[in-house]
């Protein structure tokens, strides 16, 4: 009798443990999608998310992703060799010149609908129509982009990013993936980059590195 009770107890304990793991997994998979995007009055009608993929507030870093990957990983695994599309030391697998709204677009995969990674044109439009200010929000350093059209703004934290054994440039630089691969170098993709006195976008950023993603909303 005691043996049967012990077996039942172990079974119930295991079931409860599995439910706890499943609940945590489910919770982690649920991405907090914004109720609405921020309208900066941009000519194209494109709107920007108020926070990053994996975050729930503008000042939160959210999750870090290698370019074209849609899952997070151990910070020590943001390397060339651990990149999902690593082919060999001379090249990465080509997954497309622009991955916006594809299976490789983490914003589109996680948030679905009309959300996607920003393109080069989206970021150019943002910089052409917004004033940039290096500032703090709730103690977090980052960049404020304020529309010169309607005064609305978005804040992007200077989250830096993981690369090999370091998480670099926290509070110093913001790096955000764009949807375009660098046409001049298979290893690299485009990013929006900003610091205390400079904001620009361009290629030259290794696709295997971890960066934040700030989605845009397009109808």
Walk through the language-model features, giving the residues of each.
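Bacterial Sec-dependent N-terminal signal peptides
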Residues: 1-27
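Conserved positions within compact, well-structured domain cores
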Residues: 25-219
């Amino acid at each position: 009798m005691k043996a049967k009770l012990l077996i039942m107890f172990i079974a119930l304990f295991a079931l409860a443990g599995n439910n706890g793991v499943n609940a945590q997994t489910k919770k982690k998979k649920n991405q907090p999608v914004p109720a609405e995007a921020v309208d900066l009055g941009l000519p194209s009608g494109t709107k920007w998310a108020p926070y990053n993929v994996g975050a729930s507030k503008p000042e939160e870093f959210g999750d870090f992703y290698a370019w074209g990957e849609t899952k997070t990983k151990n910070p020590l695994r943001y390397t060339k060799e651990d990149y999902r599309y690593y082919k060999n030391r001379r090249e990465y697998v080509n997954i497309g010149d622009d991955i916006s709204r594809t299976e490789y677009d983490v914003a589109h995969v996680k948030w679905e609908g009309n959300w996607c990674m920003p393109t080069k044109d989206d970021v150019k439009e943002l910089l052409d129509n917004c004033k940039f200010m290096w500032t703090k929000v709730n103690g977090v350093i980052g960049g404020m982009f304020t529309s010169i059209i309607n005064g609305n703004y978005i804040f992007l934290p200077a989250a830096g990013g993981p690369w090999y054994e370091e998480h670099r440039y926290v509070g110093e630089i913001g790096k955000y993936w764009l949807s375009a691969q660098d046409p001049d170098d298979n290893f690299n993709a485009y990013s929006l980059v900003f610091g205390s006195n400079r904001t620009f976008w361009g290629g030259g950023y290794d696709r295997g590195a971890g960066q934040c993603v700030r989605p845009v909303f397009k109808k």
